[in-house]
Amino acid sequence: MAEVDLVTLADAGAFVSHEHQSHLAAVRMSDWRIDAAHSAFRFTDAEGVEHAIRAHFIGTSSPDDGTWLWGWDNINGFPPAFVKQSERIRALGERYAIPEFTHATLVLSDELPSTLMNAVKAVTGVTAHFSAPTGNGATRAWLLLDDPLLALPRPTVARAVAVVTSALAGTATVDHRGALTAWAEQRGARLTGAGEDVVELTLDDGSLQVRFDAAGRIAGLGKRLSGAPVASEPPKEQAAEPAAPERPEEQAAEPAAEAAEPPAPSPPERRGLLQRLLGR
């Protein structure tokens, strides 16, 4: 069986996670609340329309305690549907021997939540997340959000260039080739070889060639890169993080007290990148 570890999975989820969080940052969300009883994330959009979208509780980060706690441990007794994806992560961790997925608590570092969420997105196929204050010190709840309202636009050449360059500037991706391959798989783009150290992405409106340097890092993007100088360099400066959706920090991430309509039924469970790549 192919080797699988947390870093590999986090790299696999890095580009699509960066893309989806940038997309999510443009969605105006006010008066948000987490409705655990209905596995929903509720918010009001810029036009004053209220939405209830499917939410999956993944875990909590507690800087005060220095720990990450997986949602599958479910110390709060949340409904099974709300922690289903977290339990799926534990099952995959047991199946593929990924220890970070199978220990209820992990030692927290500044990078751990984003690393875990990138890996979670790779194995679940759900690629948008929301981080919410819980009202308990600096503890935050981490959720996957899954709804057509948040769907990404189709992948175009311009979008691929923007995603790759901004992701490289704003993430700590180790395996550029693996991250690009995973992004193409997740976004339905075709990836083929186009010469030594060059691959070609076939997208909705054309194709894009990507050159790798001797260390396997992305070194250039353009229409014709094989045997030619690098067309463009990923920016050296650090890209700014996408602005977080508006949310009142004082509001706790607790189930809504009032009765409310549940979100639309859950979509069919996605087959995550891990299973697709390993054929299981």
Regions found by a protein language model. Name each.
Residues 32-38, 134-137, 192-197, 214:
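Short, ordered beta-strand-loop transition motifs
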Residues 58-70, 92, 151-155, 216-222:
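Short, surface-exposed linear segments at secondary-structure transitions and domain or protein termini
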Residues 161-280:
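Alpha-helical oligomerization segments
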Residues 42-54, 152, 206-211, 227-231:
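Short, surface-exposed beta-strand/loop "edge" segments at domain boundaries and coil↔beta transitions
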Residues 45-47, 132-136, 203-205:
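Short acidic, glycine-rich loop/turn motifs
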Residues 76-174, 178:
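Surface-exposed beta-loop interaction hotspot
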Residues 1-76, 80-83:
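N-terminal leader/presequence regions that precede the main folded/catalytic core
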Residues 37-40, 66, 97, 103-106, ...:
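Beta-strand-connecting loop/turn residues
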